[in-house]
């Protein structure tokens, strides 16, 4: 699993904002590590600038946005804070 710099900053914000948000994000990251396409919880394929990326809901306001790099067999976490900001 690979985190962009923005995702690393987002993770720090998330951890300081709420223990519940941090726990939910950690749970989702563990699911992504084992199978990025596992359902439930549901995920959404994104379009536009984020085409090729997927989103999972952390809560109403925040999303975990990630890409699956098939050739490298890596999940790249793009964002963890806000809604596609």
What is each stretch, according to the model?
Residues 2, 20-24, 41:
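Alpha-helix N-cap and coil->helix boundary residues
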Residues 30-57:
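A short, surface-exposed loop/turn module that caps and links secondary-structure elements
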Residues 1-2, 14-15, 34-37:
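Short hydrophobic/aromatic-rich motifs at helix boundaries and adjacent loops
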Residues 9-26, 47, 56-63, 67-85:
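Enriched for short, Lys/Arg-rich terminal
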């Amino acid at each position: 699993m690979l985190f962009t710099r923005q995702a690393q900053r987002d993770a720090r914000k998330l951890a300081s904002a709420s223990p519940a948000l941090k726990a939910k994000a950690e749970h989702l990251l563990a699911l992504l590590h084992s199978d990025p396409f596992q359902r439930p919880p549901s995920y959404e394929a994104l379009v536009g600038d984020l085409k090729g990326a997927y989103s999972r809901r952390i809560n109403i306001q925040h999303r975990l946005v990630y890409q699956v790099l098939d050739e490298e067999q890596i999940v790249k976490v793009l964002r963890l804070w806000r809604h596609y900001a």
